[in-house]
A protein has these predicted regions:
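Phosphate-binding glycine-rich loop
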Residues: 31-78, 92-96, 102-104, 126-135, ...
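PLP-dependent aminotransferase class I/II
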Residues: 39-43, 51-54, 115, 122, ...
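Helix C-cap/helix->beta junction micro-motif
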Residues: 96, 165-166, 324
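Short beta-strand->loop structural element characteristic of the AMP-binding/adenylate-forming
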Residues: 99-109, 329
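Active-site phosphate-binding strand-loop segment of PLP-dependent enzymes
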Residues: 108-206, 211-218
Length: 407
């Protein structure tokens, strides 16, 4: 196989002339920071998710942090999060002086489930005086943050029932899942809060940015205030020179320049999502006969943010793809394997058998709406080449290929 002449990046934003024109319009307006365009972006998100409140921020991490602050997560508190996620989901709990309790995920979906949480609760927790206590750390578990990995939505109904049973809040880290649906309903209004990411690699992007949606007015009010230093009124709405600081605050606001990109991206989301769905299905059809590759799970309502495969000899497989000009990534190295989390001495590898099994084999392939037909076919050809290359070497050594049969 002849390698590509240029490297195919793992991810690339899909920016059209319309986004560029909208940004130019804002640049010429004279108002660049948070203002009416940001307000307009929030309104479109609110309508899209059918939520009562939408607040845009400079990152999804900021959204997770402010959600926990609005819910008064503090020292002595803990929050259940999946071990198989990006660090932001857990790090914000530490930032609130609480403890993130890492829970294993389902082996097939890579999602946190009622079962994985209950296995953890049965082993480490007690429910007394209307509070769920984590015995090893002597903390009160305040809530659950589920992660919609790769665009696949967790079973929200079962998690809501579990949260209600133990008097917990339920939030969604939907950094991968803007536009995902659960039982034919758009996510964003189904739990206490939902956080989205508009980072450069996401389905829709503002370069850097995020949003939080909620139906709780008190949560929304606190978050809107905290995102900009705890001011009593937004800068662009002031009619007087004097302002007041009435709560804790941070510098988490999003600018009109970036919101302008988001407005157009959201308008284009249906076409971009359709392209991702096409690529996902094309990969599924092209790889279905590669015995032993565990293909990306099929999930109704997914936003197809990631396309993953599980393959033995993952690192060798990835290196062959790299040699052919195809960038890949790994989502994720489990948090308990990270130095920062290991140094906390809170987590035992024995609790994460599914995470361990997934991490050994998982590999993410390029899937994004800016890919051309040639790009897509290059990925398919490179995967087939890598598969045949490793298969041939195994046969030459008279080893039995350690692939389980693909379901």
């Amino acid at each position: 196989m002849i390698p590509r002449k240029t490297i195919l990046p793992f991810a690339k934003p899909d920016i059209s002339d319309e986004e560029i024109a909208k940004v130019k319009e804002v640049l010429l307006s004279g108002w660049l920071t948070t203002g009416k365009i940001t307000e307009q972006f929030e309104e479109t998100i609110k309508n899209f998710t059918k939520s009562k409140h939408a607040i845009v921020l400079n990152s999804a991490t900021a959204g997770l942090h402010l959600a926990l602050r609005a819910l008064n997560v503090n020292a002595g508190d803990a929050v259940i999060v999946p071990a198989f996620t990006f660090t932001a989901t857990a790090e914000v709990v530490f930032r609130c002086n609480g403890i993130p309790l890492l829970v294993d995920v389902d082996r097939d979906s890579y999602l946190i489930t009622e079962k994985t949480i209950m296995d953890f609760i049965d082993k480490y927790c007690e429910y007394r005086k209307n509070q769920l206590m984590h015995i090893p750390t002597k903390t009160i578990i305040r809530g659950i943050i589920c992660v919609h990995y790769g665009g696949r939505v967790c079973d929200i109904d079962s998690l809501k029932n579990l949260a209600k049973k133990y008097n917990l809040f339920l939030g969604e880290d939907a950094a991968h899942a803007f536009g995902s649906m659960y039982k034919n309903k758009m996510i964003g209004s189904l739990t206490d809060f939902t956080v989205f990411s508009f980072y450069a690699t996401k389905n829709i992007t503002t370069g850097e940015g995020g949003a939080i949606t909620t139906n709780h007015q008190d949560i929304a009010k606190k978050i809107r205030r905290m995102r900009l230093h705890g001011f009593d009124i937004e800068t662009y709405k002031r009619k007087k020179n004097v302002y007041d600081v009435i709560s804790e605050g941070y510098k988490y606001n999003l600018s009109d320049v970036l919101s302008a990109i988001g407005i157009v991206q959201l308008k284009r989301n249906p076409e971009m999502l359709l392209k991702r769905k096409f690529i996902h299905q094309y990969y599924q059809n092209q790889f279905k006969n590669l015995t032993g590759l565990k293909l990306n799970p099929e999930y109704e309502g997914s936003s197809y943010h990631l396309y993953t495969i599980e393959v033995p000899n993952r690192d060798k497989f990835a290196n062959i793809l790299k040699e052919q000009g195809i960038q890949t990534s790994i989502h994720f190295k489990p948090l308990y394997k990270m130095t920062y989390y290991k140094n906390k001495k809170l987590y035992s590898i024995q609790d994460y058998s599914n995470c361990e099994a997934i991490f050994k084999k998982i590999l993410s392939l390029p899937i994004y709406s800016a890919m051309s037909e040639e790009d897509i076919q290059d990925v398919v050809d490179a995967v087939n080449f890598a598969y045949e290359n490793l298969h041939q070497k195994k046969n030459q050594k008279k080893f039995v290929l350690p692939f389980p049969s693909h379901k």
